[in-house]
Amino acid sequence: AADTNKDQTYFLCQVSPAALHKTLFPLGKLTKPEVREIAAKLNLESVATKKDSTGICFIGERNFRQFLSNYLPSQDGNIVDVDTGKVVGRHVGVLYYTIGQRKGLNIDHEKGPWFVIGKDVQKNVLFVCHHTHKEWLYSDSCLVKGINWIVKDKNEIPEKCTCKFRYRQPDQDIYLKVLDDTTALVSYPQKIASVTIGQEAVFYDGFKCIGGGVIEEVYVDGKILSTYQERING
């Protein structure tokens, strides 16, 4: 997109090449101010004066946690400090929290901020770390599955490229090791915080999106990052 801040390739990475071949993006070369200017000239006031949308488009301005509660049952449980194994608070349902989240945790903040580093959905436990131990957030590689490659020839997939692990996050330098048609091991020379299982990892060759898939597992120093108990025990 002409406006990189509004680029939607992160969300479109799973559109098949066949579908993309038949798809037009008439606004791709225009910025939002330019679109509004055109709309004003055509007397399309509702478009020209419409405010920027915020939040998730399909739920509008509603509270996201409240929206989820209408469809997904939740149960409160313990928040555990991964460094000590001690319970430091109570959560309202692990599905309402995301990796790297700092705000909205029911923990004594007099000891400084805490960060969500993981979840045990089966045991209904939310793992956190104190801000002085943020190394728990960092990984050096991840396994990505269900990749949709947007290239004519898979031999064109570069070994070295960039990846976006979250929307509007700066692109990160990575190395791709393609394991099969839809799976790749992604490693990064500099450790990255909050790479999250279930999120999309979207690959770029320069400004061109070449594909993306779902993060299946995250690693650090050859160990699965989510095996917190194993890391506590050394």
Briefly describe each language-model feature range:
Residues 1-226:
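Nucleotide-activated chemistry modules centered on ATP-dependent adenylation/adenylyltransferase
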Residues 224-234:
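Acidic, low-complexity intrinsically disordered tails
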